[in-house]
Amino acid sequence: MTNIVWHQHPVDQAARAEQKGQNPVLLWFTGLSGAGKSTLAGALERALFEAGFHTYLLDGDNVRHGLCKDLGFTVEDRDENLRRVGEVAKLMVDAGLVVLSAFISPTREERDSIRARFPVSQFIEVHVSTPLSVCEQRDPKGLYVKARSGEISNFTGISSPYEAPLAAELTIDTSKGDLVTQVRALIDYLTAINVINADKAKALA
């Protein structure tokens, strides 16, 4: 690594952000399988996109079709999966985008490691705190049934622990209220911290 140096681009993050008229940020949605992470992140992205924001949604299942298709579900592979996603998200934020990432990301250490790569104002942890009982009842992919039967090992929430965030910027239980209200809470927060400026906030009203 001693012969590898960081190449400084002539166009920096600030210039890209100014061109897009937005403040780049990473929203990291974490929670159990079936908690509603992808649904919530997708609905927020749609709202932001329609209001003129430049966005991208990184989804836990989708990245395993390409970027992380060589990885399994051992502890080491899960760590590497999130490390790669964190690096990609950082590049996207540097490109001036509003990035939404929906991953179980079960340990605080994993999430804190990704947080540490970003300025304080550019990492927002969203804990989708839907209870296990609700997630298991939903079971959209049939994974809890397989985990309970022993067909899937090391399944978060059943045979592997989930460490809830201690100080997430936002906590949303998708079993309470409706999706519109939940997305509104996210938009209000982003407006309060000036990720969404006053002009674009009107388009989201």
Curated annotation (Swiss-Prot):
Name recorded for this polypeptide: Adenylyl-sulfate kinase
Source organism of this protein record: Shewanella baltica (strain OS195)
Signal sequence interval, chain numbering: none
InterPro entries: APS_kinase (IPR002891), P-loop_NTPase (IPR027417)
Keywords, alphabetical: ATP-binding, Kinase, Nucleotide-binding, Phosphoprotein, Transferase
Pathway: Sulfur metabolism; hydrogen sulfide biosynthesis; sulfite from sulfate: step 2/3
Active site: S105
Keyword Transferase: yes
Enzyme class: transferase
